[in-house]
Amino acid sequence: MTHPLIPDLLHLAIPIAENLGLEVVDIVFQTNKRPPVLRVDIRNLAGDTGLEDCEQMSRALETALDSQEILPGAYVLEISSPGISRQLSSEREFQSFKGFPVIVTGQDSQGKPQEWRGKLQGRDEQSIYLNQKGRSLTIDRTTVISVRLDERRSNQ
């Protein structure tokens, strides 16, 4: 379940990221830790996301969070890049990584775990499309648990 502060945090973080030429990929507020941890994953729209991007976003977001007083009490702010092994979820990510090697995890018609590997061709409301060595594969989205980049094959 998403923390109730996430919409407010996104509303605050997205314009800050855009000002810096960045995109907010994900926000997670971990209240089970003491102090709570606010993790914001960002991506540089113009190239590789570096330490400088994380530092700039951290300074700007921390200032805004402190002035808005959205988070009660002490917290830890973590800004990071999601990395190549992350799970794809948004339509923008599926568009950005079209042609990249992915691993689709799901289950077959009997409910047994199954894994498909191939180059991402796209997705629509019903299916995810892969290319496996020149052969098209259509996977029903109702059977899919996750789609993530295949870091072992992305450097090839």
Curated annotation (Swiss-Prot):
Alphabetical UniProt keywords: Cytoplasm, Ribosome biogenesis
* One cellular-component annotation, GO: cytosol
**Pfam families, from UniProt?**
RimP_N
Question: Per the UniProt entry, what are the Gene Ontology biological process annotations, in alphabetical order?
Answer: ribosomal small subunit assembly; translation
- UniProt signal peptide: none
Where does this polypeptide localize? Cytoplasm
Source superkingdom = Bacteria
Which InterPro entries does this UniProt record tie to the protein?
Answer: Ribosome_maturation_RimP (IPR003728), RimP_C_sf (IPR036847), RimP_N (IPR028989), RimP_N_sf (IPR035956)
Physiological role: Required for maturation of 30S ribosomal subunits.
HAMAP family tied to this protein: RimP
| Similarity section | Belongs to the RimP family.
State the NCBIfam families in the record: PRK00092.3-3 (NF000935)
Q: What is this protein called?
A: Ribosome maturation factor RimP
State the organism named in the record.
Microcystis aeruginosa (strain NIES-843 / IAM M-2473)
Which taxonomic lineage is given here?
Bacteria, Bacillati, Cyanobacteriota, Cyanophyceae, Oscillatoriophycideae
The gene name on file is rimP
